[in-house]
């Protein structure tokens, strides 16, 4: 896949720092809360359904990992449905289940920044 140009917008909300990452046909939202600065929460990662399996999600996730490292975070955490293809995708990308989610259908998954390859 050719290199994607990613637009990153950082927004300081006073109690948290939000990052919005946009590429053609994909986007994500990240949050670092002042009360838990070592954890970056990945609340959204979306790729246009017609454009999946082209490496866009992986490219976005690589940028998420880069932002986590640069922000001094130790962990990237997210919540996903137990029985979804997304859970399998995150497992293949190094995330591990760490707890049940906020409802019985979800699982919280995390990836330790020290386990991120590159640079």
Model-assigned labels for residue ranges:
Residues 111-114:
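A general lysine-centric signal
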Residues 42-45, 61, 78, 86:
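Generic leucine side-chain signal with a strong bias for well-ordered alpha-helical environments
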Residues 91-100:
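Conserved acetyl-CoA-binding loop of GNAT-fold acetyltransferases
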Residues 77-87, 102-106:
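Conserved beta-strand-loop-alpha-helix junction that forms the acyl-donor binding cleft
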Residues 47, 53-66, 92:
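Conserved acetyl-CoA-binding loop-helix of GNAT-fold acetyltransferases
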Residues 1-43, 48, 67, 100-104:
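Acetyl-CoA-dependent GNAT
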Residues 1-2, 91, 116-119:
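Short intrinsically disordered terminal tails
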């Amino acid at each position: 896949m050719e290199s994607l140009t990613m637009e990153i917008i950082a927004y300081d909300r006073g109690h948290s720092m939000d990052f919005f990452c946009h590429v053609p046909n994909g986007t994500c939202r990240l949050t670092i809360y002042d009360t838990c600065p070592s954890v970056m929460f990945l609340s959204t990662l979306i790729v246009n359904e017609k454009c999946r399996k082209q490496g866009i999600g992986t490219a976005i996730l690589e940028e998420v990992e880069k932002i986590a490292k640069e922000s001094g975070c130790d962990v990237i955490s997210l919540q996903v449905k137990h029985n979804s293809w997304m859970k399998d995708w995150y497992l293949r990308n190094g995330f591990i289940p760490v707890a049940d989610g906020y409802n019985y259908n979800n699982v919280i998954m995390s990836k330790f920044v020290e386990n991120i390859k590159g640079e």
